[in-house]
Amino acid sequence: MRKRGADGINSVLGRSDSGTKFISSIPRYQEKTPCAWARNELAIRYHDEEWGVPVHDDHRWFEFITLEGAQAGLSWDTILRKRDAYRTAFKQFDPARVAKFGDRDVTRLLADAGIVRNRLKINSAIGNAKAFLAVQKEFGSFDDYVWRFVDGKPRINKWRALKQLPARTIESDAMSKELIGRGFKFVGSTICYAMMQATGMVNDHLVNCPRYKAVSRAARK
C-alpha cells in the first residue's frame, strides 16, 4: 500500500520514492500473485514492496495504526487510494503533531474528501497519537513495545491457500487487549492481526508467492 521505485525491477534492498525501505527481487508489478487479495496495480505494488517486511520505525507504526483503524468496515483498496491524502492530513504520521490536533483540525479533516470523513475515526486517530506517545515514553519506542507480542522475532508461517490465513491469533488478541487498556481505539484483534501481517510481525505470504522467501530472509536478519 505504498509508492514504488521508478525501476521496473526492484533491488534486493532499496527505497521507494516515498522513502519506504523494501526488499524485493521480482518485477514491481505483476499481473497475478498467489496472494490473490492483491487484485489491482496499487495493491500488487504494496504486496510486492511492503506487505510483510518487518517495520521498525515509529512513524510507520503510527501510520499503520491510523490506516488500519480507518479501514474498519471498508476495503483496504480504499485506504490505499487515500494513503497519500492521509499522509498530508496527518502531518506525515508524526504522532507528536497529531496529538496536538484540536477542534479546528477535526473540522479540517471532516472537510477533507481525500480521507475517510468519519468523526469517530478521526477522533480515535488523535487519541491514538496521545496513547502512542505515552507508550514511547514508557518503553523508549513503540517499536520496542509492540514487538514483544511475538518475542521480538517475526513468525514465519507456511500457508498454501488464502483460506488457511487466520483473522486473529492469540498474539493479536493479547495485543488488542493491551492496546485498548492503554487507551487506543479501533484496535480490535482482527485489526491488530492485519497490522501484524502488514508490518512483518508475521509472514503470511503464501509459500508459492515470489515474495515469501525474500520476506522470510528479511525476517531472519
Regions found by a protein language model. Give the residues of each.
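HhH-family (HhH-GPD) DNA N-glycosylase catalytic core used in base-excision repair
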Residues: 2-5, 12-221
